[in-house]
Amino acid sequence: MPGVTGQHREAFGLIWHSPALDIPELPERLIGPGSGDRAAIDIAPEAPEGWPDLPPGPHDTPFLQIARGDLRLTVEDIGRFRITDGVRIAWHRQHSGVSDQDICTFLLGSAVGALLIQRGSLVLHGNALEKDGQAIVCMGHSGAGKSTLAYALMQQGWRLLADDLVAISPDGLVLPGIPRIKLWHDAAKAFDLDPLQLPPIRQGMHKYLLMGEAVQRATEAVPLQALYLIHQHRHDTPDPDASRIIRITSQKAAALRLRNQAFRPRFVRGLGQEGLNFMALARLQSRVPLASLPLPAGIAAMQDWLERQDLLQAAATAEGPALAQQDAEMVTA
């Protein structure tokens, strides 16, 4: 374990010590008196040849090995990662052509997510934003528009709590995580940003990072007020329900949808955290309303629509689906 002196990074209520790899996406923190009670995470390069063998497990894949307290991840043509006991991430660069940013991209996703799961955290795949001391979490499949929504809300006075990985404490607080937003080239242009002035998330990709001064971030854990499942929908459809926020009232449907938004369910199962994760999701479902959030196609239309919404209250006050839709939810759940 590293000592807690000097310059470190901070996220998810933890101190991250990475002397060999700069991780600019994580906020810097100068450790002072009274900070010794914060858990410190060690991030270091390490040759995989020295890693002990793991017995084959039921959740292994060609690129993943999992045992209790030990997860190994191989990213083709990038590198390998080993996450142990919720306190350490070892990384190995596949070859000299792999940049530090390439390593950071995967380290801050699957590796950090695995470490949080090892520590017993409930981790959702989404974005978290704060306003007036309360948080919302927006979830959805890859490409649903989570990052675009996060940036649009930030332009309307919200502050970013976390991107991609959202960790929720047992008492329902959303922890400040990784304060960055990733935008594709077209989205960056639509927000009047110059992609040439933004670092790409990986070499050769037309997806860019907004971090540091480009992001208004929240720095304190805050209560979770609402959960949203986002999807793109044309608001000129004749269906009157298409443009309204709909609360998911079926307990069975809500449980299934929340479970599907947990970060890397295979990690959860392989690390032996499924029971703990199930209880955390059930507790979250009982406390926080879940609703679908239909985003208009096009950034300008989405921004205009969002200005008319009160997302802190909308999930709780929204009506449920029509009876026929409720029946369909029960069948699919």
What are these regions (language model features)?
Residues M1-Q94, V98, E307-A333:
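Long, basic/Gly/Ser/Thr-rich N-terminal segments
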Residues P2-L26, N127, K131-H141, Q156-A333:
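Glycine-rich, often acidic-flanked micro-motifs
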Residues D53-A67, G97-I103, L224-Q232, K252-N260:
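Short charge-dense sequence patches
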Residues K146:
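Conserved lysine of the Walker
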Residues L149-A150:
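Post-Walker A alpha-helix
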